[in-house]
Amino acid sequence: MKIQQAKPPVTQDTSATCPLTSTVQDSSPVAGQLGRPIGFRGLAGGCPVSPQGYESPPLPLGPDSLTWRYFGDWRGMLQGPWAGSMQNMHPQLGAAVEDHSTFFRERWPRLLRSLYPIGGVVFDGDRAPVTGVQVRDYHITIKGVDGAGRRYHALNPDVFYWAHATFFVGTLHVAERFCGGLTEAQRRQLFDEHVQWYRMYGMSMRPVPATWEEFQDYWDHMCRNVLENNFAARAVLDLTELPKPPFAQRVPDWLWAAPRKLLARFFVWLTVGLYDPPVRELMGYRWLRRDEWLHRRFGDIVRLVFALVPFRFRKHPRARAGWDRATGRIPADAPLVQTPARNLPPPDERDNPTHYCPKV
């Protein structure tokens, strides 16, 4: 991805802001005024001001979009540590993960279940805005003060958009590195689609760059001036104690220990190859010309292998169901595919409103 030098400074507002469609009561001065619903207009702070929380009804993406082609592909798992670490490098987002997330207790289930609602914001068709609001509202109560005394709130528009920006750039990475590449026109189309995608959440559009060129400036500014080498980002990259994935539960612990060491080193290397140079420097990694050549050859191998996989089976179940509805394979009103029970939060967390926890 072409990166330009940042021009005007891009601020990271730390004011507490929540969308108007959220109605949970909150008594914290971090989230809002005492005794007011956090959806109260006085707390909107630039969020959309229509009663539904949207400036105009959002139009979901469909099968004619490039986002449907590249997002929800299992190859996206290869950039998972990149996306997680990039998100957590944002100081507010990293603090929220450190203080509130169950990621450190349940790495695999937390990752695998989150793919369902995240994918649904793209692939749920007419129901995508509802899914987007659900995803947004999981974050209502996630707030606090970090170790440096800085306030954070997960629904700060700058923070929420940063997470979405990593989804967009992650989609570019998947297409560029593992799917054969993109033209400049396709990058611009994906940029426009990521804006349409973001509207599904009913969040303020204030932080969203207006053009592809402005987004490149925004991304460069974030990488150079905002992101931090923090505990939450390093924890994503620490794969030395990675538990067995669900499909390998029958593998004895002693047998898993050996490949885990190799996989840990490989996935860190794969992740570093996707970082922008300022992020590599921030996190203390070197990247040689030989590394770049090997990284691209690995991407070529992935592309060739996936060419042998039928299209439907390249897709996550939520994405596959979206395609099946669009092509008439299943009814348009078929129930949305939910995460299996093995991915549910720990029993003591299942009543926590910050978790996606379907009845399965």
Positions of the model-derived regions?
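Mature, function-bearing regions of proteins
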Residues: K2-I3, P8-V10, C18-V360
